[in-house]
């Protein structure tokens, strides 16, 4: 018998929804001790991911999602992108209005990252390869060789999990389009 909106029903609905978000991957089996859950190439990619410094931000069971970081920690991401700044580029500043939060964004989880292109808050990276190269450069100050990028991408693909039966994928509305290749002539952005 339905009882309407109650604290218990809301709690149960949220718990049921959160259970649908769990998408176990082969990486979880690997973490659980199944050494063969990842291929040799995926294990090499994991090693490359760690050695490149990606785990400085992408940590924990969700491989990210636990902290905020400045976009362009080592190299100015926005200058490199080459398009005018937008309000969205201000990141956490838009919420806190603290200057120290300008250009800070929540580090995303990398689970199912192969399914979530385009990448970054502005959709500027169309592929995982491009996202890995850009992050290595602007966040870590590293230029990765193509083989290193490919190894990391191979590992990232292993983070794709199984979508639970009955789960519905969210609508694709609101996904940012890739940033324009050239800056429009009107309204130059203020330097940050």
Where are these regions (language model features)?
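Periplasmic c-type cytochrome electron-transfer domains
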Residues: 1-192
């Amino acid at each position: 018998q339905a009882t309407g909106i109650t604290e218990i029903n809301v709690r149960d609905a949220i718990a049921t929804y959160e259970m649908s978000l769990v998408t176990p991957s082969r990486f979880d089996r690997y973490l659980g001790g199944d050494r063969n859950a990842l291929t040799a190439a995926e294990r090499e990619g994991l090693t490359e991911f760690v050695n490149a410094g990606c785990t400085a931000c992408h940590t924990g069971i969700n491989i990210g999602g636990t902290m905020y970081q400045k976009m362009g920690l080592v190299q100015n991401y926005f200058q490199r992108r080459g398009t005018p700044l937008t309000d969205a580029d201000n990141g956490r500043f838009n919420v806190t209005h603290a200057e120290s939060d300008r250009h800070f964004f929540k580090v995303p989880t990398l689970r199912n990252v192969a399914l979530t292109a385009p990448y970054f808050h502005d959709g500027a990276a169309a592929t995982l390869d491009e996202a890995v190269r850009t992050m290595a450069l602007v966040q870590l100050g590293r230029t990765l060789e193509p083989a290193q990028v490919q190894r990391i991408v191979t590992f990232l693909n292993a983070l794709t999990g199984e979508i639970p039966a009955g789960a519905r994928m969210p609508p694709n509305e609101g996904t940012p389009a890739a940033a324009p290749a050239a800056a429009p002539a009107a309204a130059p952005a203020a330097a940050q």
